[in-house]
């Protein structure tokens, strides 16, 4: 079951469907208007809202693997949505007759999983110890706060610098506690900036939004959305309980350099560069929050433990595949 089935969730579903059409994939959605879109993608919609616990009763024990891709709510330091999800998944209540086949046809699930082809060797995607679900949580590398450009591995202590990151730390801790008490088995994937053809900063470049000068600029980290989907699925199979893994490629660029690479690939003008003091006066708070944090994520654990070979090892590898550049404006 995919919770928070947006762009990345749909990519996860597509990758699973491409390998085994009869694999039953559910998606929790709070909007009935999305049901048609989900069904067209071969996904069974389950209507429920993480902000309304009473609507989540149907998801108890409904799926052996849960991809938790939903962001926290917009306020507070505690992720109440993850609280609601953990409570629902740990509930002893049996699922309704309509949703029961996700577990009732366990033999079919295992047969489908065993016959899947690489890179998704999903033989473990239906765990033996049902009904304890495997939960793969899509967290953020923002939990580390500013690291001064240092290389960061998964053992580094978290130091969230804003409420958004503190809510992510809250979610991680809730899932680890639930794992410790045997309610579920969580894997935590910390994710940097996600890019894809539909997730590039083209509007920002066309608008001429400034970047920081080299001396003030910060290191950023990246992962292509398709590679991220692969990592999330592989974490369900090869991830270890309560274990953290970085979903990051090999790119080592500062933010302004990333924008310049994208601009060059699409025939756009490079962003103007300004000092940090000027950026504090000009730019919106959300963008500034990213400009205040610099780190370089290590991805050795991802490659070693999940046995991931990235389709796009770097941003440059992806940009070489884009269509002909637009003319300069």
Region locations from a protein language model:
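Mid/C-terminal beta-alpha module of Rossmann-like enzyme folds, strongest
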Residues: 231-287
């Amino acid at each position: 079951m995919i919770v928070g089935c947006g762009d990345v969730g749909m990519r996860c579903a597509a990758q699973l469907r491409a390998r085994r059409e009869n694999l039953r994939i559910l998606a929790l959605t709070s909007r009935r208007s999305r049901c048609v879109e989900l069904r067209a993608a071969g996904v069974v919609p389950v209507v429920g809202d993480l902000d309304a616990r009473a609507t989540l009763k149907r998801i108890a024990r409904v799926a052996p693997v849960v991809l938790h891709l939903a962001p926290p709510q917009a306020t507070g330091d505690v992720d109440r949505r993850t609280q609601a999800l953990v409570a629902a998944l740990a509930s002893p209540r049996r699922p309704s007759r309509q949703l029961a086949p996700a577990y009732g046809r366990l033999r079919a699930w295992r047969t489908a999983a065993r016959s899947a082809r690489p890179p998704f060797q999903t033989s473990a995607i239906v765990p033996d110890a049902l009904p304890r679900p495997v939960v793969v949580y899509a967290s953020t590398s923002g939990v580390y706060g500013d690291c001064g450009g240092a290389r960061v591995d998964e053992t580094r202590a978290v130091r969230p610098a804003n409420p958004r990151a503190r809510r992510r730390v809250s979610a991680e801790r809730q899932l680890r506690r639930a794992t410790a008490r045997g309610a579920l088995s969580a894997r935590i994937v910390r994710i940097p900036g996600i890019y894809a053809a539909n997730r590039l900063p083209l509007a920002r470049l066309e608008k001429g939004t400034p970047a920081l000068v080299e001396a003030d600029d910060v290191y950023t980290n990246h992962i292509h959305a398709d590679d991220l989907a692969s990592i999330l699925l592989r974490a369900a199979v090869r991830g270890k309980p309560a274990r953290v893994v970085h979903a990051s490629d090999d790119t080592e660029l500062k933010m302004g350099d990333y924008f310049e690479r994208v601009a060059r690939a699409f025939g756009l003008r490079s962003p103007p560069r300004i000092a940090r003091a000027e950026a504090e006066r000009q730019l919106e708070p959300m963008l500034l929050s990213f400009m205040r944090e610099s780190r370089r994520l290590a991805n050795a654990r991802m490659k070693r433990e999940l046995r991931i070979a990235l389709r796009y090892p770097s941003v440059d590898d992806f940009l070489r595949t884009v269509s002909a550049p637009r003319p300069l404006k």
